[in-house]
Amino acid sequence: MKKIFLAMIHFYQRFISPLTPPTCRFYPTCSEYTREAIQYHGAFKGLYLGIRRILKCHPLHKGGFDPVPLKKDKSASKHSHKHNH
């Protein structure tokens, strides 16, 4: 699935996006963000993050720098609670 999603984004970036005026309010662009999210988080979580990003890319949102979030380290959060007795 990951390869299919990435191929679709590549097709969009290469053949469709150049035909339309730039309208994305964010850096990286929504398509690039989705590509990075899929590569970093996998097909389904990456696609979910990309859809969330696209939904907030509208004139009422100020946009700006919005990188793909890093993975949460579950083991670090379990060990970060220190007990002092």
Swiss-Prot record:
It is found in: Cell membrane. It comes from the Bacteria. It holds the Pfam family YidD. Keywords: Cell membrane, Membrane. It is a peripheral membrane protein. SMART domains: Haemolytic. Residues 62-85 are annotated as: Disordered. GO terms for cellular component: plasma membrane. InterPro entries: Membr_insert_effic_factor_YidD. Belongs to the UPF0161 family. Could be involved in insertion of integral membrane proteins into the membrane. This is Putative membrane protein insertion efficiency factor. It comes from Staphylococcus aureus (strain NCTC 8325 / PS 47). The lineage of its organism: Bacteria, Bacillati, Bacillota, Bacilli, Bacillales.
